[in-house]
Amino acid sequence: MIFFFKKRYHVFLKAPSIRLMPCSFFFFRSFIKVIFIIRCIFFSSLSGDSCPTQRSRSTLACMFTSVPVAPTVVPGVVYSSGVHEEWKEAEQKLLDGCLIHSEGDGATKQIKEKLTSRNSQSVRCDLCAKMIESRDEEQIQEHFQVHHAALSLWCREILASKDNLLHYGCIPSGHIVSCGNFVLESAATLDMGRKTFDVIERAFSQMSQVISCFVRNLVLFPFGSCVSCGCWDGVSDADFTAIGLQDMKKGKWPPEDEKKVILRLTAALRKAGFFFGELEPLVRTRVPVVRRVQKVRVPLRSHGEHDTYSVVWSNSKEFSSPPRMLVEAAISSTVERKDSDTVTFHFKDSLKAVKFFCNSAMCGPRDMEVSWKTGSQLPEMFSLDFDLSCRAQGVRNSLFLRKYFQQDPFVRTGYLFLKKWSKLYGINNAKNGYLTSYAMSILWVHFLLENGLVKFVRPADVEPIPDLSQQKMSYLPLLRDDGDGGERPSDVLKSPELTMLRGALGGLIPLFFLYYTRIRWDKVVVTLRVPGGGPPVTPDSLGWVEANEVKCGPLRDRVWYRLCIDDPYEDNFNLGRHLSPDKASFVKVQFMRALASIVAGRPQQLLVDEQKFAEETMPAYVTRLSVQGELRNLRPVTVSALRQLLIDSAGADCVAIYEASHNWETLLDMASTLNNKSKEGDDDAEGVTNNQEGEPPDHVESCEAPRRHLLCSKMHSIDDALLVAGPLGVSDANIPAGLLGVYFLARGRAFRTAEDRDNFLMHAEAVSAARARGCTTREEILERVADAIPSIVRNGTLLDDLLVSGSEENITVQSPVVVETRCAETVQRKKSKGSKKRKNAVRRGNHAGQGTCSECGASGTDLWEASDKSADDGLYCGACWKAYNCQKN
């Protein structure tokens, strides 16, 4: 009957006489909806729905809104994943505020009730982000005792030794000189010169053109370290913000629909040629942004006189006269006609090329396709990673800090070095709830103010509403007050003009760590609102006390006052609000450890990526323990027992740093798997016995227990060989398959630790890059290496081994030109209209366990196979499948 009504309904719509009867049409449409509701109630009662009335209300709401209703799951029925994926997508969109709905929307209420009940029963750990399925305080403490006990004990022991560190006395002058040399050499690589800074300026102009073309009434501004410090290292992310100046002057900015503005900006960038997968709109953060991260980073190229930017314009239908935009583009470019429907425009000016591309994508004919020519030079905006928001505070903050940083080179140089140090030591990581680069700049400037080393700048001296003149980014050399910058690290130590700067940095960096080791965080608020030298601002005066902390709720809503860093402009806003007691202790410990490294004369330890080493070292030591048979006594394997074994082997520092951002589930599963495999081998060996003497036969004895002993013996012999080989390592051809997880491999060599491997890679890549640039003599190569590796880190023995003829057979030398060409060939950016979906496109198939992604190379992640293995037999992670689906759609 339902089919009959639907069929008659469609015939009814086609009848021409009905168009003159709007009233009859309205009543018939209402009748069909009533029949559809009755059908839903009937089938929901058959499927065992406990509340068919509520189900029908949700269905009725779905007919008038765009929110999909949660599917009713019938036991014993296998459903396709598409319905549930749609439900999850709608839930995510509702959380992000992307759906428009009314208060009485039934589907909206279902989603809200589901989320509320789920959030009310669980809480997320602020260290490892694991969901704890209860808000009970005992279970929360149990989670911390199980997964983060080593971190807590490690922090307590180091903080208890603070008095011993402070009573050490004066730092030897030789260590201060070493620190100054290392800081200056490292900082020299953070400013690539005026020509490199021009790249980000041109990229900003191109981004401004894109925004003005697709999103009206918004003006793009730069901010961040490129504005405050006036230089760029050619690698760091850029920060941009799109602001409605007219609305801001009326007090209507940021807009209420800020999340929708971010989505509009994302759509505009995609229309300009950015891939779907490399743009990620983050609308659930405190400041919504769209983040661009490249999977294949395009090498930077300085603009040359003969550079051209090619746009391919094609149309499937011929037109009598060319559109006006083509005529205008032909005037300012070189036109190359390939066939009757494809034209290539070669522009000398990248900004004109971007303007033509955007106008074509927005106003071109319907059957038109415009793309950036594969293999040709791309505009500079495609070579940057960036964050794009629509808040104005970042512009004001950057201009305010620039007034401090431009006072003296040591101010901006010290900040950029500390910014790099804080990222490597894990305390500058806003994504995981630690400090931001902006907070680190406040800490540095506050320290300088308290010691009278910079002049006080009133925050009110910077206007809250940006001016159009502030769109221009002016270059400021890092190490000098004037010039083109781009100092070579090998020259900065020889320059007599930088002697004072080197001495200032060598003394101030240790004093900075000493200042924040001594500070009483419960008595002092770090602020730039008052001049230094006066009475400190206390947490009590601002109400930033423990009694006012928000300890529950979502991570982004929790507020702590263990480390108080005052924002210069936003009232009652603590930049350290996400530092829980455990995180605050970790930050304090890192300040102390940095000071201890300088006191011990090892400043190179300041730029060691401890987080990365811990993530790589822990699985390797679990494998080593399995080979040694240490895990066989742990049945079952527990976290506490495994933790103690790793502390004894890898060290307490490595385990604690790992626990600062991870839990033990992955390592526990790995250890249990290895232990079960070992146990299966033992059971097989014990099951085959000699009937007379109860001993295993010879073939079992030779295959099981001796095999483990041989593997362990081989591992010890490799360890001895590594001690003899030194920093060059040994050939990975000597590593058996069962020991590949124990050692760290790179360029055909094997190493005992991840730090040894990275040290080898640093030297090998420096030598390879020098040879690729045409350096042939030993002196030329060493000169290039001196620009890439600080003197205190440079290993002469390793360089001698690498420069001996024939010793670099396993080191791949890849020319930068080859890399650049390969990147240009793989990046194909186009915007087409009226394109059809691929009929035989593969979809995500079954879960295939964990491993290495065939696309991005991420290891230790969940993988899914393709639905059609004959078309694609790879295994890909969730992020790559998401990017593939976006591009496919």
Swiss-Prot record:
Keyword Nuclease: no
Swiss-Prot/TrEMBL site (Important for catalytic activity) positions: 387
EC number, as in UniProt: 2.7.7.52
Localization per record: Cytoplasm
A GO biological process held by the record: RNA 3'-end processing
Pfam families in alphabetical order: PAP_assoc
Binding site for Mg(2+): 237, 239
Positions with a binding annotation for Zn(2+): 125, 128, 143, 148
GO annotations of cellular component type: cytoplasm
Cofactor(s) for this UniProt protein: Mg(2+); Mn(2+)
This protein's name: Terminal uridylyltransferase 3
Residue stretches of biased makeup (Basic residues): 829-846
Keywords attached to this entry: Cytoplasm, Magnesium, Manganese, Metal-binding, Nucleotide-binding, Nucleotidyltransferase, RNA-binding, Transferase, Zinc, Zinc-finger
Membrane-spanning intervals of the chain: none
Top-level taxon of the source organism: Eukaryota
GO molecular function, one term: zinc ion binding
Keyword Metal-binding: yes
Function: Terminal uridylyltransferase which catalyzes the addition of Us to the 3'-hydroxyl group of single-stranded RNAs. Does not mediate RNA-independent UTP polymerization.
Binding site for UTP: 225, 236-239, 394-398, 419, 423, 437-438
Location of the region described as Disordered in the Swiss-Prot/TrEMBL record: 675-702, 829-849
C2H2-type zinc finger span: 123-151
Enzyme type, top EC level: transferase
Family: Belongs to the DNA polymerase type-B-like family.
Residue ranges of the motif Nucleotide recognition motif (NRM): 565-574
